[in-house]
């Protein structure tokens, strides 16, 4: 499936039974479809307070993102998702959310030094 960075997708998460879960594509668009996997961050609607909230940006449901509930981007659970496990693109994140996601990824990956 053709996906772009910032797309919110429904995907089958490894090790979890049940329905597909939402996640955000964080892989660079320049990689195109040359890989069999796509780097993603899963979302959770079980929004919790954490010690470093910058690490789990919150997204409110909006017309363009396809979400039905307030959700957290779990940057600390980023993983390479097989392309064949991505079921659909349901929306995309806005610029503000992209900026907050980028900041969280810089910290998680140790690049914000």
Predicted segments with their positions:
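Conserved functional hotspots at enzyme active or ligand-binding sites that engage polyanionic ligands
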Residues: 1-113
